[in-house]
Amino acid sequence: MNEKITESRFKIKAKNIIAIASGKGGVGKSTFAVNFAVTLKNLGYSIGILDADIYGPSVPRMMGISDKPVTNDNNKLVPLINYGVKCMSIGFLIEESTPAIWRGPMVMKALEQMFNGVEWGELDYLIIDLPPGTGDAQLTLAQSSKLSGSIIISTPQDIALLDAIKGINMFNKVNVPVLGIVENMSYFICNNCKQKHEIFSNGGAKKESEKFNIPFLGEIPIDIDLRIKSDEGKPFCISEIKNDISEIYISIAKKIADKT
């Protein structure tokens, strides 16, 4: 891991800032971001997760946090902590059912506040759960926070892969390294026959990684317990450390730690 502290217009001290991105919604990006963060914490790193998905914040629910952040003597918000991970999300500041009906400039101001107006302290890794797509928020964060790299999350379907490619191209244009691509919902293991079923096709993300010369980080299967734990606010990689899926996350986290 690099020892250099990253500082930027969005002022935060972190040795590595990694964006978790997807070209479209519904591919499990936030689920990956949360479990990736707690896995890095389990490996001994100091971790923060910033929920940059202003319009659809998921981190509060997935991390099991319902409290509101307080302000310290420096007039900065103190991140909320669960499972040893520092967390900040617009979802902590508005009611869960209240939509953020904001235009671009207000979104940018909110994102800057979550960087500069939060007492993050020094971190080994800040994980940013980006909103889906390739719009203003993604570009601003990529250009203003000096990202160490990004991880692209996709499902095997062709339409998801097409949008993932757009994300790869965006990061290439703003000179942010793509550290790898993950194929989520890659397959399903039947509880009865124990056979592997590739419901949404399989292997597309790996083919795209080879085409773009990007590391393929791994395949994560569909698992009902993963969904249940997310809804309960208990990240799967905390509650089921010895599960096969947790081992996949550990493998991915170690690959990223070796690169950064």
Predicted features, each with a name:
Residues N16-D51, I168:
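Walker A/P-loop phosphate-binding motif and the immediately C-terminal alpha-helix
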Residues M1-G23, V27, A253:
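Extreme N-terminal, non-catalytic leader segments
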Residues S46-S97, M108:
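Phosphate-binding loop that captures ATP/GTP phosphates
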Residues I94-L141:
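Phosphate-binding/switch loop-helix module in NTP-utilizing enzymes
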Residues M88, L111, L130, Q143, ...:
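Glycine-rich phosphate-binding loops of nucleotide-dependent enzymes
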Residues A253-T260:
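Short, hydrophobic alpha-helical segments
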Residues D124-Y125, P131-K229:
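Conserved catalytic-core segment of NTP-binding enzymes
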Residues E232-N243:
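C-terminal boundary of histidine-terminating zinc-finger modules
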